[in-house]
Amino acid sequence: MTSQLLVILFTFFVQFTDKVGCERVCLSDVAMEMREQRGIAIDSLDYEVSPIYLDSVRAMGAKVLHTSRWINGATVTTGLQTIAQIEACDFVDTVYLTREEEGLLPLGKTSVSLRKRMVEENSLPSDPPPPASIEQLDQLNLLPLHQAGYRGKGIRIGVADGGFYNANTMSALPKAQWLGYADFTDDEDDFFGSSGNHGTLCVSAILASQSDYEGAAVEAEYFLFRTEEQYTESPKELDNWVAAIEMADSLGLHIVSTSLGYTTFDDEQFDFTYADMDGRLSRGAQAAAIAARKGMLLVVAAGNDGNKAWHYLSTPADADSILTVGAVDIDGEIAAFSSFGPSADGRVKPEVCAVGKQTSLLNPSDGWVMTGNGTSFACPLIAGAAACLWSALPTASNMEIRERIIRSADRYTTPHEQYGYGIPDLWEAYGKGTGNNLPYVDDYHAYEVEKIWYNGQLFIKKNNTLYNILGTNITIH
């Protein structure tokens, strides 16, 4: 019989005063090259957390789970007596309690599992037959970029989520483009096992390709981050996410898609208010803004609380300089559950929308096409679209890619509290400033170009110039 012990588990974020003894820059060669190409200087935020301080914290009996070089601190588990000793140290600025749990543990274990709600309560398969995945890409006018050869090649995408069931075995996901994975949670189950499939569904929207399904950026490379605890909802998960975003920066990823968000928690003492959604208060929002300064494009789901008491967006979706994504249906109508903006400080949120109601996805269990609901699934569509645009404009900065996407949206001049700037047009986003914003004929549709239309035959009523997808003048015979 296994012995058990009733314990109170505490997790804290310990923020340090400075970076004494820090000599190591936490950037890979790839990341360093990206910084040089974009003229982004190395600064103190790129240096490791003080190893001297970390050793001191460990020596007092705390377990260091992970660190944040941007916020300059560490996530630790320990008891109240030890944390009081740590807080009294001169090198400690502030200590934040991030999780307090009570449970029966097998002796020798250091984590507890308490059932919590689903990562995305609206992310459920639905009964009607799914639309062709091509339709949700077409809504973003992404197909012309695909036809021009821009499907995300050369772009590295991270997906931060809560579970990647079968992501390592799904035949529709390109294994040659998989860069790796990292787990920042306390969950002891297998990364690709029973931790849920929410992350895998999101990955499928970006990268899956088979005869009846096409993701948004099937030629991108990708890295998987598990940051969402399976059984609890606490501020510790935001610190997990911050650690993942910093790793993404270290690896030299271009984009991170995050279909997670935080408003209220299992323990009400940690709950945010709408006033907190100002892009500055949460460590997640702070880290997101830093990531943007470091050259990454973060794409974050707005949240599924539009028809609930909370109503507004979550964090880190409130961060500045990112793309927060709302959900619409295939006809462009807002989903009732899509969370409202603006941010508490008045910025337009969400920035853009994509299909998040009846989104076409691949089931990780059997590879069949299914549908799901949630801004969770609109988010990876925008992340994939951004990857295609960036592959077409490889010298562009993250902020230029973001700005092009926003300016191409159909409500850009009249933003809305739920649509934001609206649904982007990726072909237009590519064309702005490149000379390629031209009418075209593609393999998928018949388009009307002034007096030109297709109805069994092509008729031209007046002398117009027609261009193909690459912007080259073509002749109609």
Model-assigned labels for residue ranges:
Residues L54-L137, L143-H146, D320:
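Autoinhibitory propeptides
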Residues F225-E229, Y312, G356-Y419:
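Hydrolase catalytic cores
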Residues T94, S133, L143-A182, D186-E237, ...:
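Subtilisin-like serine protease catalytic core
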Residues D18-G21, I71-N72, Q81-I83, E101-G103, ...:
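Solvent-exposed loop/turn segments at secondary-structure junctions
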Residues G431-N463, N473-I474:
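Residue-level detector of functionally pivotal "anchor" positions at catalytic/ligand-binding pockets or at interdomain
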Residues A172-L179, A327-S376, T413:
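Catalytic-core environment of secreted peptidases
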Residues F13-Q15, H66, A74-T77, Y96, ...:
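Structural recognition of the beta-strand scaffold that forms the well-ordered cores
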Residues I245-D278, A301:
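Short acidic, glycine-rich surface-loop motifs adjacent to enzyme active sites
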